[in-house]
Amino acid sequence: MAIRQLPEMLINQIAAGEVVERPASVVKELVENALDAGATRVDIELEEGGVRLIRIRDNGGGIAPDELPLAVSRHATSKIASLDDLETVATLGFRGEALPSIASVSRFTLTSRRHDAEHGSALEIDGGRLGEVVPRAHAPGTTVEVRELFFNVPARRKFLRAERTELGHIEEWLRSLALARPDVELRVSHNGKPSRRYKPGDLYSDARLGETLGEDFARQALRVDHSGAGLRLHGWVAQPHYSRASTDQQYLYVNGRSVRDRSVAHAVKMAYGDVLFHGRQPAYVLFLELDPARVDVNVHPAKHEVRFREARLIHDFVYRTLQDALAHTRAGATPNSIGSDGAGYTGATAGEMGNIASGGPANHGNAPGRSGSAYSYANWTPSQTPLGLRVDEARAAYSALYAPPPRNAPQSTGMPSMAGTGLPATSEDSGVPPLGYAIAQLHGIYILAENAEGLIVVDMHAAHERIVYERLKNAHDSIGLHAQPLLVPMTLAVGEREADTAEREADTLATLGFEITRAGPQSLHVRSIPALLANAEPEALLRDVLGDLREHGQSCRIASARDELLSTMACHGAVRANRRLTVPEMNALLRDMEATERSGQCNHGRPTWARFTLSDIDRWFLRGR
């Protein structure tokens, strides 16, 4: 078959296949153009989910009459002029493909007026056929009207979903935009009826956050704002008990652009680590700011993805920032105590605990089977399988934590004391500690405590398990990770890419306890392994580490395996169900919870405590009605 030059209309329709997937894609491209033009108000009118009509009206800078035909020409743009501009682009659009692509598959009208012009001008395009520029009355700004999307491409139109589905995609993208640009007023109408209005406000406005993601997220979100190495990460991360079954509340913006990035998503998941219940997803709204020259935005047709020039640095920065924010959450903090450093934790309410429980079974440390409650224990089996790990080195740290007290010391349960923590033992307002004072033990499982707000219920095994676990981790962090030399080096057959990674990352592997040299194109000599994990299938572990280093630039496999061992030890060392505690022992546990990082969840991600305010209890008994 002979090679031929494709006609311009067909070229535009091919480009439309990449840029215009559905009505939401059209709305995205047109609204981004409005924002790049400096608009502070954008009106979006839709009919039949955007298939019949999409009309975008803005108050931006407008387009001159003689530039209207150029605006709908391929690769015509006002945003870049050279390769240097492309490498440092800061606008949302830059390719000049959107308008001609949309115009080629719809009945398209572009009307615009510059602020210094006496009247506006309009240009109509019908399925790619260009009309004449004509004068038209119009307010300063631009209106783009897209009718009968895909009317001339029946195969594409056939794949569009139901009206409600297409409208849902548009609304989801507008939520994402509303979070990124709270300074812009957005008005949306569908089939002639107003459906949504986002009022302009401050970036950190609780009102904008609440109306986009819901009041629950706004109440449970931790503010994050950290800068370093020419990077800034700010926004909100939901507390661990506010988790989701899906990734529907994960928003990442790079220099104001909504994107998806596997490396950043991996860093976030790592940061949540052992505070997120199995199978649940974190919720967050994060803004990453950096020099535009350090990120390539020209890697995806719809600009949904970016490529970082220093991916490892970005991954580490995001991970450490969020890990620090989540580490400072402690049991007993009220919503008012949550600051920009992430310190503070509001605890799970009864409804939230039930929501977490619906994602999987819960472990209450030998608790008897129950039915008819939010949790079901009868058929529960531990989610952590026994590990073939060497525990001798961990025993020393474990024993040190639980050494018998001196003869003249008061008796305790072996729970670490709060002495020397430097943390306030009481709340500033009432003089009562955040978790209050113990008043009773329920069925040998729960501690009931009274604080200034009402009733606190604590799962004593889960809470003590977290306390022991954090103490064990801190003890091992102070010791460091030791390498165990092998009497006979182990030869490991790997792929060439894995061997290249091992050679390139030799220093990183050494910090993890592996001493590795290259034996051949597809083989490695392993001369030492992490001592604590000597019996944990080092070959499989090393392969996983190499895979992580190749894909993400770093690996948490060693730390995860170590933490899994310490978590198992903490679970076995924690106070068990049906253990009767005295009131002083229960109070000691409450004080330790207030002083321990991540004490809002046990090692498996379950909540350790819940709060029932006095007003909640009054409502149960219809008091005040």
Curated annotation (Swiss-Prot):
Signal sequence interval, chain numbering: none
Protein name: DNA mismatch repair protein MutL
InterPro entries reported in the protein's UniProt record: DNA_mismatch_repair_CS, DNA_mismatch_repair_MutL, DNA_mismatch_S5_2-like, HATPase_C_sf, MutL/Mlh/PMS, MutL/Mlh/Pms-like, MutL_C, MutL_C_dimsub
Pfam families attached to this UniProt entry: DNA_mis_repair, HATPase_c_3, MutL_C
Molecular function GO terms recorded: ATP binding; ATP hydrolysis activity; ATP-dependent DNA damage sensor activity; mismatched DNA binding
Keywords: DNA damage, DNA repair
Gene coding for it: mutL
Domain of life, per lineage: Bacteria
Described function: This protein is involved in the repair of mismatches in DNA. It is required for dam-dependent methyl-directed DNA mismatch repair. May act as a 'molecular matchmaker', a protein that promotes the formation of a stable complex between two or more DNA-binding proteins in an ATP-dependent manner without itself being part of a final effector complex.
One GO CC term, this protein: mismatch repair complex
Region (Disordered): 404-427
Family: Belongs to the DNA mismatch repair MutL/HexB family.
Biological processes annotated in GO: mismatch repair
